[in-house]
């Protein structure tokens, strides 16, 4: 077992009841274009077109052969674009249950389907987009083959759903998905889990790896770093446990599986709990009559690295398993730095709340101050479990020194791996965005 001692579990109020409830009826669903790093769409539909579940909506010009398919049948309601015509979302008004059929197998047959057929089925159905590479956190090329594959079968994000509960309600589909994944690599498939009881694969190529401790113990980047680190010439893939279930269901039912169990939680949620819904579901519909106040920020994903769900982005992200809701921190506090802070969380023990570690707090979106220079006072080292020099790396990312950043390990990282650094930073830097800028530059220029 690998125990993560450096890190931080945010004590946020509004933890979800770990019981799965049926979510509300959804009439709109969307694919969010900006989730896919470097993707340049070639549209296959226009507004007003009628589409089936599993039908291609657009393809990636820069990653030939990768298709993005409709998660439901209905009518293309909107194609939203932002600055420089960047694709923000393709919205489908759900109607009917027509679906494109894909090859279907029994659980026994799955063990011998063959890599070529698995890849073709995943690409044709659009399920291929669930896979992500490391380095760069992009959708793999259709002809790529990873050294190994990591299944993230745990979640230590604040307010997250219990992975064990969800997997054990879909045991057969999960093991079917593992049987498919092991045929995609000549190496190992690592199922990274907590101290939980999960269905096991009988294959010697599928290994369970146990992780415990504080966040980021449940992140793919942490698992990859400790088990099979990547480099500029070595690529591994990662996939979330719910997508493993979706792979299994796709191949055994012959239909694209879009169901997802999410956590709807946070201090601004009336009844925090787990909901059964679909990826891409309208967040406005999922949160209707669920919020304590109107002045809130609804986030698709974790409070640490999620996306504000508004306007064209108000849909559940492809890689998100939770919706987090915080009150907006509009109010200014006079001499806030001088108050005891019994209701504020502090990493540096600046407030008296540090004496009560068991207390949870009604976090808001306030940053507690304005942006300023980076202040290296040892905070990053306290919450960074990876074998890197965080202060040096973050400084190089800020100034854009990609050569030094590579030497210090930036290729191993994704935005979520630096989210805690952003949280504890006295200078209020968003390290995820500067990391992405550096990774994009490295990929382009080497």
From Swiss-Prot:
What is an annotated GO biological process for this record, any one?
sodium ion transport
Task: Give the Gene Ontology MF terms in alphabetical order.
Answer: oxidoreductase activity, acting on NAD(P)H, quinone or similar compound as acceptor
Pfam families reported in the protein's UniProt record: NQRA_2nd (PF24836), NQRA_N (PF05896), NQRA_SLBB (PF11973)
What is the superkingdom listed in this entry's lineage?
Answer: Bacteria
Transmembrane segment boundaries: none
Q: What is its EC number?
A: 7.2.1.1
Q: Which key words are in the record?
A: Ion transport, NAD, Sodium, Sodium transport, Translocase, Transport, Ubiquinone
State if Transport is listed as a keyword: yes
Catalytic reactions on record: a ubiquinone + n Na(+)(in) + NADH + H(+) = a ubiquinol + n Na(+)(out) + NAD(+)
- The stretch of residues making up the signal peptide is none
EC class name = translocase
Biological role stated in the UniProt entry: NQR complex catalyzes the reduction of ubiquinone-1 to ubiquinol by two successive reactions, coupled with the transport of Na(+) ions from the cytoplasm to the periplasm. NqrA to NqrE are probably involved in the second step, the conversion of ubisemiquinone to ubiquinol.
Q: Which family does it belong to?
A: Belongs to the NqrA family.
Q: How does it assemble?
A: Composed of six subunits; NqrA, NqrB, NqrC, NqrD, NqrE and NqrF.
The protein, known as: Na(+)-translocating NADH-quinone reductase subunit A
Organism the protein comes from: Psychromonas ingrahamii (strain DSM 17664 / CCUG 51855 / 37)
Encoding gene, per UniProt annotation: nqrA
């Amino acid at each position: 077992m690998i125990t993560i001692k450096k890190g931080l579990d945010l004590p946020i109020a509004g933890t979800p009841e770990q019981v799965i409830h049926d979510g509300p009826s959804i009439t709109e669903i969307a694919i969010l274009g900006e989730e896919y790093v470097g993707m340049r769409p070639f549209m296959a539909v226009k507004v007003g077109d009628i589409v089936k579940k599993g039908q291609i909506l657009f393809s990636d010009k820069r990653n030939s052969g990768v298709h993005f398919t409709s998660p439901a049948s209905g009518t293309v309601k909107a194609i939203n674009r932002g600055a420089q015509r960047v694709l923000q979302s393709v919205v489908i008004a759900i109607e009917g249950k027509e679906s494109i059929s894909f090859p279907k197998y029994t659980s026994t047959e799955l063990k011998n389907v063959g890599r070529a057929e698995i890849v073709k089925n995943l690409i044709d159905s659009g399920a291929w987009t669930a896979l992500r590479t490391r380095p760069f956190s992009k959708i793999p090329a259709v002809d790529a083959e990873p050294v190994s594959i990591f299944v993230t079968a745990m979640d230590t994000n604040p307010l997250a759903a219990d992975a064990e509960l969800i997997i054990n309600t879909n045991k057969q589909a999960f093991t079917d998905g593992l049987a498919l994944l092991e045929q995609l690599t000549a190496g190992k498939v690592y199922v990274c889990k907590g101290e939980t009881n999960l269905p096991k694969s009988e294959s010697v190529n599928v290994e369970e790896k146990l992780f415990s401790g504080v966040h980021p113990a449940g992140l793919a980047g942490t698992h990859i770093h400790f088990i099979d680190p990547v480099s500029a010439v070595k690529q591994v893939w990662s996939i979330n446990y719910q997508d493993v279930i979706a792979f299994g269901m796709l191949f055994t039912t012959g239909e694209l599986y879009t169901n997802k169990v999410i956590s709807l939680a946070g201090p601004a949620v009336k009844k925090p709990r787990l909901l059964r819904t679909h990826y891409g579901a309208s967040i406005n519909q999922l949160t209707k009559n669920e919020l304590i106040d109107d002045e809130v920020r609804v986030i698709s994903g974790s409070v640490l690295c999620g996306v504000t769900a508004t306007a064209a982005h108000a849909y559940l992200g492809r890689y998100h398993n939770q919706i987090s809701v915080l009150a907006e921190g509009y109010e200014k506090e006079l001499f806030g730095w001088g108050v005891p802070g019994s209701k504020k969380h502090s990493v540096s023990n600046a407030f008296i709340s540090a004496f009560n570690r068991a207390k949870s707090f009604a976090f808001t979106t306030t940053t507690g101050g304005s942006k300023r220079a980076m202040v290296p006072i040892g905070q990053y080292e306290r919450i960074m479990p990876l074998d890197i020099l965080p202060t040096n790396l973050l400084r190089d990312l800020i100034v854009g020194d990609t050569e030094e950043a590579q030497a210090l390990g930036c290729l191993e990282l994704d935005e979520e791996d630096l989210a805690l650094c952003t949280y504890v930073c006295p200078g209020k830097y968003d390290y995820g965005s500067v990391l992405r800028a550096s990774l994009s530059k490295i990929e382009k220029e080497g």
